[in-house]
């Protein structure tokens, strides 16, 4: 009895710990979660656009201040060796709010109040000793090799305050010998609508500055991005994804989880020389497609979502696999990498051909598009014939 009672207490204590972990984030809508800060915590999330993916490692320290590291991944900036993992990565570490001046004094004494996620990260903080509230908005560009941040300061006092916002550009240059296209340039550009960045804010008035993290190849023109236009484009993308194929169950957790999964699956499509390529990400897998992840799993999902960029990525990936069909019925590669110019396979077939054939057939049925089906039919037939040739004596496909 004592043993069972002890085990029961351990189980209840574990459940309590798990419950505490779960309730750090609160669902505020079917598409949004919020962390109301009440202690130290660190977390991470990846967000992507057609030309960029960024992993944010963020949190709140013991002083209540915001801490962040941004690992920007540029899938089309290929590095040497140009393999599965050959996407340029660069860390931009630290926050920029401390560069602001309020009445000539540094902006210090931050207390982060909330962190919200809905495809965009929003961080709200107060600086009680300075009479300032700050809202940070973080998100990827939908179309450019850039990640965007907006810092908006509000005067929360009943008297005017002078706010000075930073303006500068930091540049980093990669080793020419390690880039497929030579040296790449990475920049962090801070700017505000007013050239000198100085504002006299009355009670309740706001001022903002933007930070654009961008990548450039040789001879690329400098991007002139406006954070508000980029934010509008991101919101349009999210509205489309969140508004289609809405899951409604008795569980708010499952509904919200599905909403976030739709965003992640759709945003991680990269515009490459090999076409639109949906990739797993995770600081490892970009500008490449796999027989399982893409052909079998997510490609048949996109017609249900009604996302045209997703359908395009599906057709592009099937087209890449079609290039490897052969009269000898040798296996297809497991993955097609480096923007489609190379491939990776295991010794023999791990079921990749069956995956591709299944996914192509499911996609054709789901899309209901005769033109697409006609393009996919040779691939489907080839995969079926391959599998037929792999039947063993018991009628099971060998792989």
Segments and roles (model prediction):
Residues 1-21:
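Bacterial Sec-dependent N-terminal signal peptides
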